[in-house]
Regions:
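Non-heme di-metal
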Residues: 2-218
Length: 218
């Protein structure tokens, strides 16, 4: 009976992870929080609009990756070490990341931009990395969240220097996302996340650089 119950819970966790992936890639995201955006965004010229759309596409890809990461790590928390509290912690962060997905998706549409054509690849890669981190243990898994969120926070800060100041809506979205990412990193650290070795963090930055460079164009 216990074995059957464990298998049932594992199957449920797998189904939830698959459902999360399908919704991320193919459904229209809906935010759980309303974002108070400026309504007086002045018209952007063609170059400004193109640049903003390019940066917002990169941010949208980052949120697709976040969904893959958190889905995999929540799955790992349930399957590898049966920790519902940790899985719940990760899923709560995922809900806020889904808000980011919705905000960037909507802004991309407003800018007449399109999502990256490689979103399924980005999601799959992030899911695989998240599952690997989870397999290495709770502290590594949470440490991976800390490092990821800190790098995303720095990335968003750089976008705030690159977005045209007149694009007040995009700037407001990025600023709010940056605040959320900083909070997610602190929570994961407080929950026991370890500091990852510098070579690992450097490899993560390298992978992120490839993703952002490609996503700006494709």
């Amino acid at each position: 009976v216990l074995i059957g119950l464990a298998m049932s819970r594992t199957a449920d966790a797998l189904i939830n992870a698959i459902d999360s992936g399908l919704r991320t890639l193919f459904a229209t995201p809906h935010a759980s929080r309303a974002l108070d955006l400026p309504t007086d965004n002045p018209p952007l010229n063609a170059a400004q609009q193109r640049d903003s759309a390019s940066l917002m596409r990169v941010n949208h890809v980052g949120e697709v990756c976040a969904q893959g990461l958190y889905a995999a790590q929540a799955l790992g928390a349930r399957v590898f070490y049966k920790d519902e509290a940790l899985a719940g912690h990760l899923e709560a962060a995922s809900v806020e990341e889904n808000d980011h997905l919705a905000w960037t998706s909507e802004r991309l549409h407003e800018l007449n931009g399109r999502p990256s054509l490689l979103n399924p690849v980005w999601y799959a890669g992030s899911f695989a990395m998240g599952l690997l981190a989870a397999r290495l243990g709770k502290r590594v898994s949470l440490g991976f969240v800390v490092a990821t969120e800190q790098q995303v926070e720095a990335h968003l800060a750089s976008h705030m220097t690159r977005l045209d100041p007149s694009d007040t809506r995009s700037n407001a979205i990025v600023a709010h996302m940056k605040q959320d990412e900083a909070r997610h990193a602190k929570r994961a650290q407080a929950a026991g996340g370890m500091t990852l070795p510098q070579p690992v963090q450097a490899a993560m930055r390298g992978a992120a650089k490839i993703m952002t460079t490609v996503a700006q164009r494709i």
